[in-house]
């Protein structure tokens, strides 16, 4: 580990400036080093956050393949069954926003550990819930608990990791979310077929507890985080509004909305197309699409390395272009072309999200937790709003309409990424 170079000193200076209001200034003869790529502490932090990403998304999405089982077990309609996921994601969107404020005054390590453990225990509670409304309450609480991880994880990495290794570390975290998103769907489906949906959800809960224990054991303590307790509403409002004045951050928030909105909308409705003629795939065959999430496991760390080498804007533009290519392939009739298109969209999404989320932490010089929370709020709003609206588009215009909707979003995203590249070029010229 080494002391931060010139490019990282503005972040350390901002944190020191914030802390100076609460702590007297003292000489700093031995500045605390950042986690540098290749060191043992760096890999401990990266692997710990991979476990956190896995646990978060496996706990979140484990119910998705079980919606028909819920309909049969509790005698509810498919729309009512889907509340077991939509209520959780809605609560998560709210919670990540609140967590950005709370995390400024509490230990990031403890907050993430508590959130993961509470979510895993609530998942076990879901597996034994005797009534439908109790299951929904537990899933909503789970979404609120999970909100303590995503924004805080992004802020932790931005504060503790050396800038030259931030892309890879963020990529490993996002790769963990990809593994979790796939495992949460695939494991529950397989276990439910072999035993029951209750055992399937309980299994995910137990795996979540084990992942939390591994996370807690591996994650190095924060050295560059300065807790700020007792901050009033006016402070948080000012800090929140300040994020929109930092050049580039609003564009990254927009990209979070575009990336997740496009990705979820495609995954929500491609199944309807494949169930219909001429494909007539079974639910099990369509479920195999979730294995494409493995593309995200590869894309996230790879895009991080590429961003560290070639620049974030170039990788973002390439990721969005790959998503557009994949979307075009889904308009073709051969099933192999559609499958390849879904893989391209998945790879591009995880690569783009990895780069954009890491970039937020680099640009937010103060209140990193709040900046990360704003990004994730936009991210989950994209999932909720565009994903829901896509259903109306599907009903009226079929897959061509859905592809058109996603295509418009990707054009907006490309415009934002090009604008970011222009901002970075002007900053280098001014320097």
Spans of features found by a protein language model:
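Paired small-residue
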Residues: 122, 133-141, 336-344
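Helix-loop-helix hairpin linking two adjacent transmembrane segments in secondary transporters
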Residues: 163, 172-219
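Cytoplasmic helix-loop-helix junction between adjacent transmembrane helices
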Residues: 140-176
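C-terminal transmembrane helical hairpin of 12-TM major facilitator-type secondary transporters
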Residues: 313-356
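Juxtamembrane intracellular "pre-TM" segments in multi-pass secondary transporters
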Residues: 30-38, 220-252
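Helix-to-loop junctions at the C-terminal end of transmembrane segments
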Residues: 96-107, 299-311, 394
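Helix-breaking motifs and short loop linkers at transmembrane-helix boundaries and internal kinks
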Residues: 75, 107, 128-134, 332-333
């Amino acid at each position: 580990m080494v002391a931060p170079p010139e490019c990282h000193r503005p972040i350390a200076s901002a944190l020191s400036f914030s802390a100076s209001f609460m702590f007297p200034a003292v000489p700093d003869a031995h500045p605390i080093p950042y986690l540098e790529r290749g060191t043992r502490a760096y890999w401990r932090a990266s692997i710990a956050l991979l476990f956190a990403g896995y646990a978060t998304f496996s706990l979140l999405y484990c119910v998705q393949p079980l919606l028909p089982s819920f309909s049969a077990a509790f005698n509810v309609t498919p729309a009512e069954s889907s509340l077991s996921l939509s209520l959780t994601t809605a609560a998560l969107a709210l919670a990540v926003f609140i967590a950005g404020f709370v995390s400024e005054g509490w230990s990031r390590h403890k907050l993430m550990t508590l959130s993961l453990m509470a979510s895993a225990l609530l998942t076990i509670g879901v597996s034994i819930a005797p009534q439908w409304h109790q299951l929904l309450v537990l899933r909503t609480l789970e979404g609120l608990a999970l909100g303590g991880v995503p924004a805080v994880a992004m802020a932790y990495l931005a504060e503790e990791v050396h800038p030259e290794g931030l892309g890879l570390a963020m990529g490993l975290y996002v790769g963990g979310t990809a593994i979790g998103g796939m495992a949460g769907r695939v494991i529950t489906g397989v276990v439910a077929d072999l035993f029951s949906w209750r055992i399937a959800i309980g299994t995910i809960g137990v795996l979540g507890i084990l992942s939390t224990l591994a996370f807690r054991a591996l994650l190095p303590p924060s050295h560059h985080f300065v807790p700020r307790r007792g901050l009033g509403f006016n402070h948080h409002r000012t800090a929140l509004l300040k994020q929109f004045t930092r050049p580039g951050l609003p564009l990254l928030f927009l990209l979070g909305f575009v990336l997740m909105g496009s990705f979820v909308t495609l995954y929500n409705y491609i199944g309807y197309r494949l169930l219909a003629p001429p494909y007539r795939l079974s639910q099990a065959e369509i479920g195999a699409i979730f294995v494409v999430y493995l593309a995200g496991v590869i894309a996230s760390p790879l895009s991080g390395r590429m961003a560290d080498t070639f620049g974030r804007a170039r990788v973002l533009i390439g990721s969005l272009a790959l998503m557009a290519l994949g979307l075009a392939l889904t308009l073709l009739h051969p099933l192999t072309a559609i499958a390849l298109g879904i893989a391209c969209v998945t790879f591009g999404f995880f690569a783009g999200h990895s780069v954009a989320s890491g970039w937020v932490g680099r640009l937010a010089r103060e209140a990193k937790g709040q900046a990360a929370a704003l990004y994730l709020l936009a991210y989950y709003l994209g999932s909720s709003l565009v994903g829901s609206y896509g259903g109306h588009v599907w009903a009226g215009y079929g897959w061509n309409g859905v592809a058109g909707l996603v295509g418009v979003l990707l054009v907006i995203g490309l415009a934002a990424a090009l604008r970011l590249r222009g901002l970075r070029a002007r900053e280098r010229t001014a320097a």
